[in-house]
Amino acid sequence: MAIRDKLAQLAARLHDAPQYNSQGAVLFVDLEHRATLKKYLPLEVMRNFLGGRGANMWLLYNLLDEERAALDPEVPLIFGTGILTSSMPSATRGNFTSMSPESDAILDANGGDYFPSFLRTHGYDHIVLYGQAPSWTLLKLAYENIEFVDAAPYVGMDNLALPKAIERDFQCVEREDMALARITTAGENQVLCAGIMGGIKAIWARGGGGAKMGSLKLKGIMVHGTPRELQPVEPMARYNKVIGKKIIGTSVIKNALKMVGTPFLYKPSRVLCALGTKNHQETSWKESLDADNFDPYRPGMDGCYLCPVHCRNQNDMTPDSQGGWGAAALKGLTGNASYDKAQASVEHGKQRNYNGILNDGKYDQYDKGDGPEYVTLGKFGPLIGIAEPEQVLRLNNILNDLGLDSASTGSSIAWAMELYQRGIITQKDTGGLDLSWGNYEAIEKLLFMTAKREGFGDTIADSARAVERGKYPAAALDYRMTVKGLFQSDPHDARILKAFALGLSVATRGMDHLRNRVTLEINARINDDPAFKTALYNGVVSAAPNSYEGKEYAVRKCENNYAVGDSVGMCRFNTKLFNSPTLPDTGDFAVQLSSLTGQAFVEAEMDEIGRNISGIEHMLNFRLGLRAKDDTLPRRWFEEALTEGPFAGEKIDRKEFEAMKARFYTVTGLNSEGLPATDWHEKLSRLITGFSLRVELPRPLPGAPEQIVVIDETVGDVTALRQALLRKLPEAAAELNDKSWNVAVNGAMVLSGELTARVSSGDRITLVPIIAGG
């Protein structure tokens, strides 16, 4: 069904006015016809899925035609702000959601800076984009005014140049009276690892959102005008102070994130020997990339809209800069190196020695910027064999300008480097590039080639799909570090960390730690009291990072917390369990949601809402063809043991892993194919589409281990039902096309007139084999 037809059906279920206090509108934007429609989501969507990520999934489920390619303009790109975005400390974020062109799963990228808060204060909670614009377009929003602006003058501009041009042409200043979500040349060229930029460093990175936005010929979304404050009611304002104190009073925030940012994570990972190195062939790297080695180049910190933390470390290697912000901030913090406490006091005394990247005294725009985050430090340090802080900083700044996801881009380059090392590809394939580990000159050049899809950059631009697109031989898949077709999001090697590994395997957007990372495993010796862990995770969880026992409870609890956090707009860094067990939790979110929306929430139901959000994501991925077999890990982690560190010899045991995964499915409420079990599935279907048919099968079929299929698309007769069954279970087509299987509706056999036999939501359908006899 065409998206405009799907939208017409959906619009009939939506409202013309807000359904609760502070609700913003959903703006549907038909880029092809330059038309818009403004509606409001039903109250039950907020009650069961919140906003942001959760409500995005509700919209995507109703509008997606999974039989189309991800870059088809009929597949929508959806942005959603959290319900508490701009109204609570550190709630600054929103999600871009679609079907991923980069992976086999959903696209769902979370980001902050100023765009989500500006959008929400201008009266919009969600934007649904579809159709390809007739020419490159800038969507300009200013409260009720919506304009489709010719973006031809901005085509070819990257992240540093574009906002300057917008500021000039519209006489505005980014982060003061303008916010801009935009793509770079990488997005224009549909580079699969291109993100959507929201600031000098802020990026909606994962899953290929930049390519998806480029497929719509949309250069950017501009929110123009000073944001109106969404004035919190008095109880909310008072409790915001409690939340702010929780955040700022937490040790990891106060001593690490506010002072040096996420690079503090490099040392504990290095000491544990859980640091992906040379495409995970090794697991430890140089001390030269410990966070204190960046001190001389750190002039200060920046942050998102009204956030009290300011965790974004800035960098400046130019001659007149003043570094030293946060110098020695981590010294003596034993929690930062719990497996080798002496390392906590090690300072390297790094001095400024940068004289331009060619050591010729020449500097350019890439010698200063924002970042790096730990992800970029790991992906463009140990993963590709780079050991110099200055080289990492410069690569970080180039990535930010080019709008490339550092996780996927770094992993794609590391994959290519290992293939080059093994002789699977040669300089004939790379266009003469020497892809030896640590070859900085080749790596910098390759980034620009990737954004333009030039030469071997065209291969890197295809990210994890390079084999599928004919760029590498099938043998290359043995060395691809992906789950569900998405490269790993962070630099950790999880062969030691069993909960971490489980989380990466079941994460709904692919191999991504931000869905459910059990961070306390990394520094397990800080919080290893069994009773504490049991209370924290609602189940008995082993304190040993390399144990499989109880880790399903830890992943389940983290997944619920983070899904709720995304859907209210809270930064992951400041959400309980990601960095600390003392940070704001779902109980705090419930208090503020109740105050802001006028709807009563309690902590217990927030946990269930988190489960609902992951449940709808599992349902979406099932529609995209993913099954339990896709909840797995790269071959290397099962077959190759660690060779160094306190856990040398560790790897993932397949039997133990599968048992742990099965337990996770059970505590989550999934069946053995990773799909919500029948009763929960029916409940979710009614909440999402307003339609649910339970079809009982004569026996278990591929994809239907419970002998039941839940149909959640509206069908009116038995023929339409049979077609829906085939769409739901294409792997069982032979059985479902068996004409000897009759249909019974509410116990009554349909013997003739099948084309006109009516079915309705809630009916009980049974497929009954004909019994032959004579």
Where in the sequence are the language-model features?
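A short acidic Gly-Thr/Ser loop motif
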Residues: 215, 773-774
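Ubiquitin-like/PB1-type beta-grasp interaction modules and other compact soluble beta-rich domains
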Residues: 689-773
